Regions:
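Catalytic alpha-helical scaffold of carbohydrate-active enzymes acting on polysaccharides/glycoconjugates
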Residues: 1-174, 197-220, 226-280
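Positively charged, amphipathic and often flexible ligand-engagement surfaces
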Residues: 161, 173-195
């Protein structure tokens, strides 16, 4: 634990609720060039229907969240992005069409970041400063620094935030835990909401117990097209309500955690953002 770290108002644990806001971008044509209608409409449930249930749950529980949003979603669903902002949540980047970053060339990935940044700024009225891509390439960190991003969220290697450094640039990493709804529910139509709730409570409980020794960071990764379905939405609401019953919990947006991490940078690990280091 890091005994030099201090969350606002002496709170002992920062909970980051993040939602990867995507739609049919993940549904690729088959070898005949045809789209699977069932898979497409399942994915589109998120931006067309589920997002409104998610926003309602967040409002009812009184917590803030971060929406990692595909540029294509922002382009096609401007009112949904506007509602996210109006409800006090953060909009960050998640690729344009949920591209697999490791499969992109340097120039292709640069174009995705630039296009996504511009579209989110157009729809949200504010430039995004956080990013999470579908996988990560050896070029990702340097490209995010090049484009002025504050934070990234793709690593699973630490519990607490840490700093990537390259030349005169610094990028905050907000690490993830591999227990999101995508794994709990198999992304589409499997999994038990009660089992997911047990997993998420266990994640929080362990971090909360450890926070007696020093402030902790507890990230959650959800998807509107997964966790907004009836039954699953109840599990989402229940885990938030469960955490809210504990003292000293800070429900923070990604930028809030990242800004404080940067401010207290001397107390956090620093790693070189080298292509060789990332690839290894």
């Amino acid at each position: 634990m890091n005994d030099k770290l201090c969350w606002p108002d002496g709170r002992r644990i920062a909970v980051m609720l993040s939602f990867d806001f995507q739609g049919g971008e993940d549904v690729r044509p088959d070898r005949n060039g045809k789209i699977n209608h069932e898979e497409w409409t399942q994915a589109e449930y998120g931006p067309q229907t589920g997002i409104w249930r998610i926003l309602r749950i967040l409002e009812e529980t009184g917590v803030n969240a971060t929406f990692l949003t595909c540029g294509g979603i922002a382009e096609r669903y401007p009112e949904q992005v506007k509602a996210i902002v109006q409800n006090g949540h953060e909009v960050a980047g998640h690729g344009y069409h949920h591209e697999v970053a490791r499969d992109l060339t340097l120039e292709q990935e640069r174009e995705v970041i630039e296009k996504t940044t511009a579209m989110i700024e157009k729809r949200a009225g504010k430039r995004p400063i956080g990013w999470r891509s579908c996988t990560q390439s050896p070029n990702s960190l340097e490209l995010l620094m090049e484009h002025g991003y504050l934070w990234n969220s793709n690593s699973f290697s630490f519990d607490l935030p840490f700093l990537w450094e390259h030349k005169d640039s610094t990028l905050v990493e907000l690490p993830r835990q591999p227990f999101g709804d995508g794994r709990a529910y198999g992304h589409h139509d499997s999994g038990n909401p009660n089992d997911a709730l047990v997993i998420w409570k266990g994640l929080f409980d362990d971090f909360y117990e450890e926070s007696r020794l020093g402030p902790a960071f507890c990230p959650f990764q959800f998807h509107p097209f997964i966790s907004s379905r009836p039954g699953r939405a109840r599990a989402l609401k229940e885990i938030i309500q469960y955490m809210r019953k504990h003292d000293g919990v800070w429900f923070a947006r990604g930028s809030e955690v990242a800004e404080l991490t940067l401010k207290l940078g001397a107390n956090f690990p620093r790693k070189p953002a080298l292509k060789e280091a990332v690839a290894s």
